[in-house]
């Protein structure tokens, strides 16, 4: 319904702690928390921003939250989360592998999540192959795309994603965050 899937909102009770760790990205956190509470999640997210702003880390936090992955397990170790660097895997065959695997339900989590970093590096053929799956996504699949160059992502892909523009976190906000962590850990900092 309208590109958003309706899920049981109670399935996500108490698992948004990782989202709270996304300091300086209040709009993204608020939007995702509201989507989780209402049970209406987009099937594809697009994270944009300059290099080093935290797009890949944010993608992993979103994946951890959606699939309720415990802190003791790395997101990259989870069998229902697949991460692909489009800079190294630009071709249509790489995307077709994902599309083929996406047909199968997740093994141990609510969703199969595909994180595609540097998505703007995909070839035209790869984008075209991906488009059909984005138009009619399996209910158990979520895509998280990250890019530094939004202009290179076709509008047909952009229009099927919920977009978040990540901003560099202000130094004062970071400083306050580190002070809070140090205080909780009983560590003194200058």
Task: Describe these PLM feature segments.
Residues 1-163, 169-183:
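P-loop/Walker A NTP-binding region and its immediately flanking N-terminal helices
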Residues 182-190:
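Short, intrinsically disordered, charge-balanced linker/junction segments flanking boundaries
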């Amino acid at each position: 319904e309208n590109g958003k899937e309706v899920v049981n909102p109670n399935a996500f009770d108490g698992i948004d702690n990782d989202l709270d760790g996304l300091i300086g990205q209040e709009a993204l956190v608020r939007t995702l928390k509201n989507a989780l509470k209402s049970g209406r999640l987009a099937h594809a997210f697009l994270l944009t921003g300059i290099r080093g702003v935290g797009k890949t880390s944010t993608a992993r936090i979103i994946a951890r939250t959606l699939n309720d992955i415990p802190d003791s397990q790395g997101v990259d170790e989870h069998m229902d989360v697949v991460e692909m660097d489009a800079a190294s895997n630009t071709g249509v065959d790489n995307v077709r592998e994902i599309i083929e695997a996406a047909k199968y339900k997740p093994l141990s989590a609510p969703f199969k999540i595909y994180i595609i970093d540097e998505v703007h590096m995909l070839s035209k053929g790869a984008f075209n192959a991906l488009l059909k799956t984005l138009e009619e996504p399996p209910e158990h699949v979520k895509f998280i795309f990250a890019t530094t160059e939004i202009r290179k992502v076709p509008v047909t892909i952009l229009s099927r994603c919920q977009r978040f523009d990540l901003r560099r976190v202000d130094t004062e906000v970071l400083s306050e965050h580190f002070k809070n962590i140090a205080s909780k850990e009983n560590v003194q900092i200058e």
